[in-house]
Amino acid sequence: MDSGSVFNGYWGYVKGGIWQISHEITKINKKIGVHFHMSSNISSIDSNKMKISFKKENKNNEIDYDYLIFATDPITPSKILKNKDLQSKIEDNDFLGTSGKITAFFKNPVIWKESSPYKNSDSSFRFIFSNQTLSDFEKSSQSVIRNSNNYSPGYIQVYAEGAAQRVLNNKEPFDKLIFFIKNIKYGKTGDQLNHVKEKVKEIMFKYIKNTEDCVSTEFLSPRDLNQIFYFPKGNIDHMALNENQNYNDRHFSKNIKKSFYLYGDYENIFYCGAGAYPCGSVAGTTGYMCAKQLKRLIDSN
C-alpha cells in the first residue's frame, strides 16, 4: 500500500497506474549502472560455471553472474536450472488461485447510492460480502475447489481507481472501478464465464446510481491470470495462503539460517517473488528484503 504514497500516490493508488513504480525503479537502477536485457529468452543456466545463456533478437548471448536472484513464480527457476528434484518438491505446494478481476469503465464519475460527507470518500476501498457467517464464508471458498461450481460468491473488493486518479489530479477518459472477486473456479477463461461477470455486475450495480454510464467491462478469471501472466495456477500471490504456506513457512531455502531467500540448496541463487511473500506478485517487498540479506551475506565474507 505504501508504494502509492512514494510515487505521487494516495492510499496505495499510483498516479498514472501502478506500473509507474517499475518505471521509476528502472530510472534509479539505470542511474547506478544496472544493465537491462529486455525481450530476452533464457536458454540455460550453468550453476557450476555461473553462466547464463540467452537469446535476444535471434542472437545468442552469455553473461556471468556471482549471485542470481529470481523474481518469478517459484516453479520457473527450477525448470530453467533443469533441477527436476527441486521442481518436483516445489510443485507439491498448493498454487491454486480462486480470484478474478473485473474492470468496469464508466463514461461519467461513479455515483454511489450510499454516499459519505467525507472528502474524497468516493476513492475509498469497499467490500461487498455475500456470506453472513464464517462457516458460510469457508463453504463458499471450498465450493469452487471441491465442486463443479464456477462461481461461489464470497466477497467483492472494490478499488475505486477512477476516483483515486481524480484525487491525484490525473485526468483519464473513463472512470474505472476494479472488482476483485472471490470465489472463481480455476479452469475456464473470462470469455467462457460471461454469466459470472453478469452476476458480479448484478451484485455491484445495486450500490451504484448511474449504472447506465457503464460502457464496458473486462473480466479476467484465474485461468486468464495463468495464460496472460504465467501464474502457475492463476494465483496472483503465486501460492495459496493456507497451512504451511504462510509468511515464515513461505520459502524454498534449505538453509534459512544463512538466508530465508536462498533457492533450494544453491549457495548463490535466491528467490524473491510473491511465492516468498504474498504481495500480489509484486517483488518490491521481498526484493528489498532479499537484497538486504544478500548484502549482509556478501559483507560478512
List where the protein language model places each region.
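Flavin-binding catalytic cores
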Residues: 109-110, 149-151, 170, 189-230
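Beta-rich nucleic-acid/ligand-interaction surfaces
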Residues: 35-54, 218-231
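Helical element adjacent to the flavin cofactor pocket in flavoenzyme catalytic cores
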Residues: 2-49
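Mid-domain catalytic core of redox enzymes
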Residues: 41-169
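Conserved FAD/dinucleotide-binding core of flavoprotein oxidoreductases
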Residues: 75-79, 105-107, 171-203
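A conserved FAD-binding loop/helix module that cradles the flavin
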Residues: 272-298
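Hydrophobic, well-ordered secondary-structure elements that form the walls
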Residues: 69, 179, 204, 269, ...
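A glycine-rich dinucleotide-binding beta-alpha-beta segment and adjacent secondary-structure elements
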Residues: 209-277
